[in-house]
UniProtKB/Swiss-Prot annotation:
A Pfam family annotated for this UniProt entry: Toxin_cobra-type
Cellular compartments annotated: Secreted
Residue pairs linked by disulfide bridges in the UniProt entry: C24-C45, C38-C62, C64-C75, C76-C81
Family: Belongs to the three-finger toxin family. Short-chain subfamily. Type I alpha-neurotoxin sub-subfamily.
Keyword Secreted: yes
Domain of life: Eukaryota
Matching Gene3D superfamilies: CD59
Name of protein: Short neurotoxin NCA-04
Signal peptide location: 1-21
Tissue spec: Expressed by the venom gland.
Amino acid sequence: MKTLLLTLVVVTTVCLDLGYTRRCFNQQSSQPKTTKSCPLGENSCYNKQWRDHRGSITERGCGCPKVKPGIKLRCCESEDCNN
């Protein structure tokens, strides 16, 4: 009986996703697409754009950061929504 109970606990732990994490794109500007799993509890992704001497720059990642005036920011809350 103890063996059966232990087996059920192990199977339940392995099969259940006990910590869901958001996945966001994190490539910069025109780099090839890459994604990353966000820290536990971080439920949003961002796409930040600005211009400088190099041209148009895009930064992507987890969260929704505060930005300075003149920087475009788009935050979203679904998988891979920040491309």
